[in-house]
Structure formats: structure tokens, C-alpha cells
């Protein structure tokens, strides 16, 4: 029936987390087809779009304007515009803007499609060597309010846990994890995934603390912690 031929209007398009070769053919084609591209930071996305010869109207869509922008974007979608959302790196709406827009579009009965593609936590989990049959993704922990509550709630977690962390907080986070999970808990930290200086450090939380106290702390970090055995 014709009902099933609804053209998908909102696409969530993953972008490389460091290596441009990780862009999929389909991602490039969708970005060339849509009418509007929403980017987390237009300056970050410009080189990527230029590299793949994508010349489209690009608007900023980030955590500071997404609440306001959603209704306007929904209006464009209802007019039949095709829109793609990209984040600075990886899959939109995973620890990045996008969730509010997806929810609003679905509420309005619009079609939403997320393309498979780059995301930082999957390679970090797989190459950590920690059990990955069951895991929980925690993203960024709250910076202040609710941080200790969240950590206490995870103290009994049996699944492998995955966190995102920024370089300036990584040592403090390792110390907090030692307090909650103990010195001997197995863990793995991946940084600069898919880039030239990719590094995966595995061992106990104590091993990781020693390593990062004595080595430069740069790049994007994914922190995997083994569950309670």
C-alpha cells in the first residue's frame, strides 16, 4: 500500500570519530540528498562535508538551542523537507543532541531513521577484553549534582559499564572508581579511537591510575569497567 512508501524525513547520520575513512557510502549519499543538515557545531562539520563534496544548507543544532529549535525543525519536516542531523563525531543522540528532536518527530507521526555507523563505545567495549554479552552504557556521569548517587547505584552492577570522560577529569574519575569499585577491579580506557595515536590501556583500576599519572592525557576517553563478580 502507498502508506508504506512514506519518505523518511528525518535522518540521524553517524560521522567518523576520528578517521574519515569510517564514513559510510550511504551516509554520504543521504547527506547529498537531504535539503537541510543540522550540525552540532558547523565549524567542526565543515571540513567533513567539504571532504565528501557535500554542499547543503547547514544549521547549528546543539544542547544550547535544541529546546528552542525543535518546533521550527518539525515545521520544516511537515512541509516535506528532508533533514539530516549529524553530531561532531559518532552517532547523534548518543551522549549528544538529538533525543528531543527524535521524540518530537515521532510524536508528530513523522518518519525517523538512524543510519548504522561510527560510535565510540562499541570498539572500546569490544577491544577492552571485558565481558560484552551484557553491558550498560552510562555515557558522561553528572559533573556535580547526582554524581555520587549514580556511582553508588553502580557499586553492585554485574554488567560491564561504559563511560565517556573528558581528559581534564580522567584521573579524578579513576580515583572515584577505585573508591566505589575497589583497587583490583578490571577496567580498560580507550582514547583517540580510530586516530593515529589510538591507545587502549587495560588492567586493574590501580594499573590505569599509574599509567595516566605518568603519561600525557589527551583526546577523547571511553572508560570500560568490569562488573561485580
PLM features: residue spans?
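Glycine-rich, flexible N-terminal cofactor/catalytic loop recognition
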Residues: 5-63
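Loop/turn-to-beta-strand initiation segments
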Residues: 9-10, 80-84, 160
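Short glycine-rich anion-binding loops that position phosphate/pyrophosphate groups of nucleotides
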Residues: 17-20, 88-92, 167-169, 228-229
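Short active-site oxyanion
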Residues: 31-37, 110-112, 160-161
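Conserved helicase motor
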Residues: 61-67, 141-142
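Glycine/small-residue-rich loop that forms an oxyanion/phosphate-binding "nest" at active or ligand-binding sites
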Residues: 62, 70-119
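Class I SAM-dependent methyltransferase SAM-binding "motif I" and its flanking Rossmann-like core
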Residues: 100-157
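A contiguous loop/helix-start segment that scaffolds small-molecule binding in enzyme catalytic cores
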Residues: 160, 164-229
Amino acid at each position: 500500500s502507498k502508506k508504506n512508501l512514506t519518505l523518511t524525513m528525518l535522518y540521524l547520520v553517524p560521522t567518523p570519530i576520528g578517521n574519515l575513512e569510517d564514513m559510510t557510502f550511504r551516509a554520504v549519499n543521504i547527506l547529498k540528498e537531504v535539503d537541510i543538515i543540522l550540525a552540532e557545531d558547523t565549524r567542526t562539520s565543515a571540513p567533513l562535508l567539504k571532504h565528501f563534496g557535500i554542499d547543503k544548507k547547514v544549521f547549528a543544532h546543539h544542547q544550547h538551542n535544541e529546546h528552542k529549535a525543535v518546533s521550527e525543525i518539525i515545521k520544516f519536516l511537515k512541509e516535506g523537507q528532508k533533514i539530516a542531523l549529524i553530531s561532531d563525531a559518532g552517532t547523534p543522540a548518543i551522549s549528544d543532541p538529538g533525543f528531543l528532536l527524535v521524540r518530537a518527530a515521532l510524536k508528530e507521526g513523522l518518519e525517523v531513521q538512524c543510519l548504522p555507523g561510527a560510535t565510540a563505545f562499541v570498539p572500546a567495549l569490544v577491544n577492552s577484553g571485558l565481558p560484552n554479552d551484557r553491558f550498560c552504557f552510562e555515557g558522561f556521569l553528572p559533573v556535580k549534582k547526582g554524581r555520587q548517587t549514580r556511582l553508588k547505584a553502580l557499586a553492585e552492577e554485574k554488567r560491564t559499564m561504559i563511560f565517556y570522560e573528558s581528559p581534564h577529569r580522567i584521573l579524578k574519575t579513576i580515583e572515584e572508581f577505585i573508591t566505589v569499585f575497589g583497587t583490583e577491579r578490571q577496567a580498560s580506557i580507550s582514547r583517540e579511537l580510530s586516530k593515529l595515536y589510538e591507545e587502549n590501556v587495560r588492567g586493574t583500576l590501580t594499573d590505569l591510575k599509574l599509567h595516566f599519572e605518568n603519561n600525557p592525557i589527551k583526546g577523547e576517553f571511553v572508560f570500560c569497567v568490569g562488573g561485580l563478580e
